[in-house]
Amino acid sequence: MSVAVLAFGLNHTSAPVSVRERVSMPVDLVKPALEGLRATFGGAVREAAILSTCNRTELYCAAEGQVAEHLPAWLAEHNRLEAAALRPHLYRHQHDDAVRHAFRVASGLDSMVLGEPQILGQMKDAVRAANEAGALGTLLHQLFQRTFSVAKEVRSQTAIGAHSVSMAAAAVRLAERVFGQLEDARTLFIGAGEMIELCATHFAAQRPRSMVVANRTIERAETLAGRFSAQTMKLADLTERLAEFDVIVSCTASSLPILGLGMVERATRQRRHRPMVMIDLAVPRDIEPEVGRLDDVYLYSVDDLGRLVQSGTDARRAAVVQAEAIIETRVQGFMHWMQSREVVPVIRDLHQAADDVRAAELERARRMLARGESPEAVLEQLAHGLTQKYLHGPLAALNRSEGDERRQLLAWVPRLFPGRDSRR
């Protein structure tokens, strides 16, 4: 049975953060998810990889049969959701559409921030996790290697990454909307990953009054804080110290909210209702959405920042056209490679059949020589036997055919035996 490439999932355009956070998969859960997927579908899912970020959860797989029809139910069951509630937010791509989607994602064309570079690293992490789980094979390995190559080509030959308004820069803009200049702002960063590092870089450029990094692992917090002359604190101290901060930016891998309504409500009272800007870049969310109902709190989710960064995409629209052209060419190249793989078993069988004929005729020739027959007669018989057996299949097919089938076979004769036309 033939194997197809599938890309399946949801992203920031098809699902709000309230849905995305429910199917988000931390790195440590990707391996068991892949194992569960392959156990569910058996050999029908040959290869698989899961890409899960703040803005998307996608499954890439090499699969056979009707697997694609059952993936929504699997994803819903895996995350303990109702399939009917999840299905409207899902998309599915197959064959060349799946390849095109992978190329566009890695190139930043499908990102909330058009042209953002982080997605390429996230996709490489996803491939590494799939490989460590033993879920990658020749097909997806080749797909992702070409995906990374295409992304590099797009970035080097177009301006897709230029004029980018990043999520980190958008976070600064949102804080400035409330406080104006940030010189007097006390800023807290919760987490110590790449996104927090980017945000800290942008906020540090505004020279806020203070910057503090809180993280579950204090050593990582100290490493990040050292870059910006910031202080550190333990997550356990958030309850006591939250009221100190004017701006809170959070992005952790926690599966449960870190800042709840009660904690923030107490902090606003301690602040005597001075405003707080809270920017939640995590999926699943670090801050309970109910916090946004408090009068003195300006809560922004990753989707809110996404709407802000869209204003910076106009200057890159021309680059998108160039990028799409590059991607289309590379998609066709990959599909040609896939089709050539389908021919390989046929070519192998043809070679084996020809070798079997050759071996049989050689053995016959050796027996004739052993009986003392003349070499000339043996060579004549060998050539005749090879010719008859090699042509038996094509001639039998021609004799059995009729109508359009015969015309098609006759049209192929000059291509299969290219010297034929010149002898007419």
Swiss-Prot record:
GO MF annotation terms: glutamyl-tRNA reductase activity; NADP binding
Active site: C54 (nucleophile)
Site (Important for activity): H101
Listed EC numbers: 1.2.1.70
InterPro entries reported in the protein's UniProt record: 4pyrrol_synth_GluRdtase, 4pyrrol_synth_GluRdtase_dimer, 4pyrrol_synth_GluRdtase_N, GluRdtase_CS, GluRdtase_dimer_dom_sf, GluRdtase_N_sf, NAD(P)-bd_dom_sf, Shikm_DH/Glu-tRNA_Rdtase
Gene3D superfamilies assigned to the protein according to its UniProt record, in alphabetical order: Glutamyl-tRNA reductase, N-terminal domain, NAD(P)-binding Rossmann-like Domain
Miscellaneous comment in the UniProt entry for this protein: During catalysis, the active site Cys acts as a nucleophile attacking the alpha-carbonyl group of tRNA-bound glutamate with the formation of a thioester intermediate between enzyme and glutamate, and the concomitant release of tRNA(Glu). The thioester intermediate is finally reduced by direct hydride transfer from NADPH, to form the product GSA.
Family: Belongs to the glutamyl-tRNA reductase family.
Full protein name: Glutamyl-tRNA reductase
Protein source organism: Bordetella parapertussis (strain 12822 / ATCC BAA-587 / NCTC 13253)
